[in-house]
Amino acid sequence: NLIRGAYHYYRPDEDPKLQAASYLRNTNLQKGDFLPILDVEKLPKQKSLEQFIADIQTWMDIVEKKYKRKPILYTYISFYEDYLYYHFKEYPLWVANYNNVAVPTSLFDWKMWQFTENGITAGAKVKIDFNVFNGDENDLKELLID
């Protein structure tokens, strides 16, 4: 079986309420799909760090209210460690780390690890992201919509 999902690339200088509304309007996640995923990769240019954190929390709260589960946070390990950990440690973590390591060396409990954006596989005409799951089948089910 193939598990599908939908992520939102967070734009830090834009309104988080409008971004969450757009995500909810344009996705139709079903039972068995991944929980909603928020991709946070950049700091804002026009907002303080405090406002940035508050805005991410606003997006998370709006989407969590709809699905009754905490969304998955996708980000780079260093970005998570530097800016997000203390505020979002209760959210499932999907990390990106392309540094040719056996496993990410993070003290944090990551659920998924995207280790390349240059994967090649049968049936795909372009390079794709490859990921590793950190857990067993029951752990995976925790990341899916009931």
Regions found by a protein language model. Give the residues of each.
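Substrate-binding cleft of extracellular glycoside hydrolase catalytic domains
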Residues: 1-69
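Hydrophobic faces of well-ordered beta-strands that scaffold small-molecule active sites
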Residues: 3-7, 36-38, 71-73, 93-96, ...
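Solvent-exposed loop/turn segments at secondary-structure junctions
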Residues: 10-15, 41-46, 77-81, 99-103, ...
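Short amphipathic alpha-helical surface micro-motifs
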Residues: 18-21, 74-78, 92-97
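Contiguous hydrophobic segments
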Residues: 37, 46-50, 54-55, 71-73, ...
